[in-house]
Amino acid sequence: MPSPATPARIVLTTTANPEEAARLGRALVEERLAACATLIPAVQSIYRWQGAVESAAETLLLLKTGTGQLVALEARLRELHSYQTPEFLVLVVEAASQPYLDWLQSSLGQP
């Protein structure tokens, strides 16, 4: 039987460019909605938008957070993001080292 998942989550969103990803990541970490933001530049996305298949160069932003921050994180991301419909995908972290989980939890919460 698999072990229960940790309270850690990874949120994926894409941005128009590295500058926007850095701005969003910094704001969300400063506001303690994310413990860490990792930027992966130069990804290529292919998607359907308003009936047409589109392609765009984007920056992938990975946000490490906890279950208790997800609602506020999504709301704040929607406020700050330039996209009309920003991506907000949540991945469950099945396992992580206890020191990392301790750090993550201590980095979240009230500023």
Region spans (language model):
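Positively charged, small/polar-rich N-terminal and surface patches that mediate targeting and assembly
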Residues: 1-111
